[in-house]
């Protein structure tokens, strides 16, 4: 599995010769914070999807959604294309949001119609996308820590317990009118 692969040797890619906008790498990550769900109003943790340029490590696109799905991925890619042009290749994992027909289908898929190649990583091998995995460990946490409802690493457990109690109480009060 992936734990064993961490012990094995690996080949580090040389991204220094990669042209800008040649390879984009994308992945979604759950935010370690709670906010109000726009449909039912209960507290939930939103999903953020980042797309970065492989050569420069610059975040070219992002999307915030209710869950990691094809619309979140497409939104992040759209944001990137709108602001930075079209990549030659979009590299991602094999998640359902990344490999849906809306993105990949030969004739009607967004990526083939734009002429963007879409290879995916080996299932269970996040090391192949280490650049985006590293970003997902740091950037969403820095964003989420700015909110009182942050529940990730380093959050005060007692404060978190009280905050969750207050959130549940507020939701109940809203439902009762």
Which residues fall in each region the model found?
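A short, structure-level motif marking secondary-structure boundaries and short turns
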Residues: 39, 62, 91-94
């Amino acid at each position: 599995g992936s734990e064993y692969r961490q012990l094995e040797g690996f080949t580090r890619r040389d991204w220094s010769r990669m042209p800008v906008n040649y390879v984009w790498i994308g992945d979604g990550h759950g935010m370690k914070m709670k906010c109000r769900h726009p449909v039912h109003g209960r507290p939930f943790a939103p999903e953020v999807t980042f797309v970065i340029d492989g050569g420069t490590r610059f975040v070219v696109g992002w999307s915030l959604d209710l869950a990691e799905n094809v619309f979140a991925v497409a939104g992040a890619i759209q944001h990137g294309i709108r602001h930075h042009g079209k990549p030659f290749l979009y590299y991602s994992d094999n998640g359902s949001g990344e490999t849906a027909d809306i993105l990949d289908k030969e004739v009607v898929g967004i990526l083939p119609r734009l002429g963007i190649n879409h290879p995916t990583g080996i299932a269970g091998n996040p090391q192949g996308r280490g650049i985006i995995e590293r970003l997902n460990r740091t950037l969403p946490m820095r964003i989420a820590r700015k909110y009182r409802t942050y529940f990730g690493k380093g959050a005060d457990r007692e404060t978190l317990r009280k905050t969750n109690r207050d959130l549940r109480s507020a939701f109940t009060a809203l439902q009762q009118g």
